[in-house]
Amino acid sequence: MPFNSIADIIEDYRQGKMALLVDDEDRENEGDLLLPAACCTAETISFMAREARGLICLTLTDEHCQRLGLEQMVPSNGSVFSTAFTVSIEAASGVTTGISAADRARTVAAAVDVNAGPADIVQPGHIFPLRAKDGGVLTRAGHTEAGCDLARLAGHTPASVIVEVMNDDGTMARRPDLEIFARKHGIKIGTIADLIHYRLSTERTVVRIGERDLPTVHGTFRLITFEDRIDGGVHMAMVMGQLRRDTPALVRVHVIDPLRDLVGADYSGPSNWTLWAALQRVAAEGCGVVVVLANHESSQALLERVPQLTQAPRQFNRSQSRIYSEVGTGAQILQDLGVGKLRHLGPPLKYAGLTGYDLEVVESIPFTE
């Protein structure tokens, strides 16, 4: 069964219909049933609970979460894919126990009302809000972001009710199961990768702002600068040689770490590609790119790492959500540069959502002294 186009899915979404979205096989490898939150009813909640069987959640933008006064469920998110649960919610009025389909639909309506504020909800409750990353699927290739993106693209409030699809035996539904589900219920099915493609055809969260030659001790690179539209940060790409989409390119996506790249702190491990080591490797082969991403580490976090250097070698510890943001940003830059296949300078890792950017890691090269 071929996937439906994102344009067709958006049209169904505009009409208040449900959609199925499948994520990367290297990520959760699951499908979620999504519905514009503005179109949520007791009947649709009942259908989700009965047919999809997963946890019914509400995707909201960061701005909307702030307006409702929603705090994260835990201060430090340790989930594998950094799904940003807030404390669960209930409508402040118009509900009984809160768990019925009608009560949950009422809670969704109260939360997504354009004039909603903290007084309109209570906590905890039976609806689980998920905070989407700014930039949507271009920043994080998850169902949370996809739900907000689809609703926005369809002209609704950027919020969706979503639920994972499970099989009768309680196992997660994979693509063959999801195709059967879609046919049975007449629901269109697509992929997050295609949604990324769709958005990239008209928009970016990083834009190229400059280019010049840059002489270094390792030779002359082309220095290309990019501005991050989300946080105003500046990212750089240092390119040597001619990059071609069908030819594997030596690539390092590198987040500046002052202790390692400026002071020379010695970190051990296969991911210990310093900026200078990566540039040297690219120069030795004569072709490749080192993408240098802005470091969002706070001054306090940096100071806390200094005493640790005398205890044991440590990696620059970034949150999983930050890593996913970096993957999305780096992927957009690589696509802009014309890279298709990557010989990645770093340990073997699976990066979610790369297929949406037409990127494929064909080789991983660990650091060796």
Predicted feature residues:
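Catalytic domains of riboflavin
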Residues: 1-369
